[in-house]
């Protein structure tokens, strides 16, 4: 789900959403259904979309891009926190640590991750290069997280993303 005022109005070509879709197509070998949304930087719109994707569409993982900086309209983390039952602070911490190896301004990022029911929701940076740098690393934990929440087993292409699972959880 891309969060961007300009992209949602068609004033700017969304590059973040396609970068995430590219990763999915390269890394995930299991059959999957992808639902794409491009919405404005608005807390209520973001919350509504997240709730719809999890509660109505049954998404086990919802990945957002955009709206995580310090600008007044960057409200994706607040919307994510509002709809999640439990937060997963390691996601935001790890994404900032990864990005700090590339740019000092990564400290300005406010990405979060959390659980809504048995679904994982997390925010990625907005730029395709930063998306790839972070998703390559954090996705290593996502399939096992989905396993633990009772979701479908995600088979990964180990050459693209060597996801970690304890021996007892491997198929």
Residues covered by each model-derived region:
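Non-catalytic beta/alpha edge segments that cap or flank active sites
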Residues: 1-171
């Amino acid at each position: 789900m891309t969060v961007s005022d300009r992209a949602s109005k068609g004033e700017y070509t969304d590059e973040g959403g396609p970068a995430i879709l590219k990763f999915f197509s390269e890394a995930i070998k299991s059959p999957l259904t992808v639902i794409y949304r491009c919405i404005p930087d608005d807390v209520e719109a973001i919350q509504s979309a997240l709730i719809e994707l999890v509660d109505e569409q049954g998404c086990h993982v919802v990945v957002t891009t955009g709206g995580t900086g310090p600008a007044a309209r960057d409200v994706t983390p607040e919307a994510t926190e509002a709809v999640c039952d439990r937060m997963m602070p390691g996601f935001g911490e790890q994404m900032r640590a990864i990005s700090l190896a590339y740019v000092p301004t990564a400290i300005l990022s406010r990405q979060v991750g959390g659980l809504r029911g048995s679904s994982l929701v997390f925010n990625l940076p907005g730029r395709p290069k930063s998306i790839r740098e972070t998703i390559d690393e954090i996705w290593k934990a996502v399939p096992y997280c989905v396993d633990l929440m009772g979701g479908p087993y995600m088979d990964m292409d180990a050459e693209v993303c060597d996801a970690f699972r304890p021996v007892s959880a491997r198929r």
